[in-house]
């Protein structure tokens, strides 16, 4: 916690200098999940040379360190800083989907750019609370820290275990529910398997199930890095009701948009995940 407090108070130039040192430690010293990252990159981009894979891996670790430190910094950032550093490209898409911010919407995204800053930037710019659905971390101290960061501007984080019940109970209230849906379920036999980045991957079906039960429209939020410490968010349509109960149109559309986003900026996606492990 002492380190967290120190990092959160650092001005941005010093924060990114510290992030560079963390990148060196992660990649060269600790070699944090290097084998997993390189294997994932090789499978996703079989056309790339080994030199290109290594370069992409290094860029990923540098971005990972920067994003981690930015998330810590978020606790000390003002609303004006988020408005300056996170730009919404097409907020009208969200307003249209929500019938003028009156009907609830499910927004799916991926671990790309800075998904935590995206939450704050959109919530502040639109002046509405955005409720993220999250998977609790094993470390209770870190989990509480992340919870506090996510809820600092009025958002109400929902754990995956309580999300369906809570969303159904409040289905007549206007809310924006955000789900980072690119993690594989622990019990992969319960997931929906489809082709993703040249490999078969399992995806949680919860977001699709909730959308069909509530008839909420579904959007995809793509977070792009413009330069160090600055991002833009663009919304894309995933699916709108009525939904076919027998199809997986929502997941299929989400996976297609997720893959397009990753291929456009591969170094900023979370390659350390074991997405394709059966």
PLM ranges: what are they?
Residues 1-109, 143-144, 148, 154:
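Membrane-anchoring hydrophobic helices of lipid-metabolizing enzymes
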Residues 35, 116-117, 143-144, 165, ...:
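Residue-level marker for well-ordered alpha-helical positions
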Residues 66, 101-161, 173, 186-195:
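Catalytic core of membrane glycerolipid acyltransferases/transacylases, capturing the structured
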Residues 84-91, 112, 139, 157-160, ...:
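A conditional alpha-helix N-cap/helix-loop micro-motif detector
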Residues 2-6, 59-60, 83-84, 110-112, ...:
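Short acidic/polar alpha-helix capping motifs at helix-coil junctions
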Residues 29, 55-58, 99, 124-125, ...:
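Non-catalytic C-terminal accessory region of glycerolipid acyltransferases
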């Amino acid at each position: 916690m002492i380190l967290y407090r120190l990092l959160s108070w650092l001005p941005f130039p010093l924060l990114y200098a510290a992030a560079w040192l963390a990148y060196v430690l992660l990649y060269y010293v600790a070699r944090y999940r290097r084998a997993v990252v390189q294997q994932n990159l090789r499978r996703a981009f079989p056309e790339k040379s080994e030199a290109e894979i290594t370069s992409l891996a290094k860029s990923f670790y540098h971005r990972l360190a920067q994003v981690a430190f930015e998330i810590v910094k978020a606790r000390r950032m003002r609303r004006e800083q988020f408005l300056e550093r996170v730009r919404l490209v097409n907020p009208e898409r969200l307003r249209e989907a929500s019938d003028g911010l009156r009907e609830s919407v499910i927004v799916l995204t991926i671990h790309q750019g800075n998904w935590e800053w995206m939450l704050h930037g959109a919530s502040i710019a639109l002046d509405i609370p955005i409720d993220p659905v999250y998977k609790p971390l094993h470390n209770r101290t870190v989990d509480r820290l992340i919870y506090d960061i996510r809820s600092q501007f009025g958002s109400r984080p929902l754990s995956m275990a309580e999300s369906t019940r809570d969303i159904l109970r409040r289905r007549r209230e206007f809310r924006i529910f955000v789900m980072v849906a690119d993690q594989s379920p622990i019990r992969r036999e319960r997931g929906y398997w489809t082709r993703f980045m040249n490999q078969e991957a399992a995806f949680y079906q919860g977001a699709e199930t909730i959308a069909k039960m509530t008839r909420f429209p579904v959007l995809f939020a793509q977070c792009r890095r413009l330069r160090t410490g600055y991002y833009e968010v663009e919304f894309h349509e995933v699916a709108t009701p009525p939904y076919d109960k027998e199809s997986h149109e929502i997941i299929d559309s989400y996976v297609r948009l997720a893959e397009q986003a990753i291929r456009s900026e591969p170094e900023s996606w979370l390659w350390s995940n074991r997405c394709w492990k059966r």
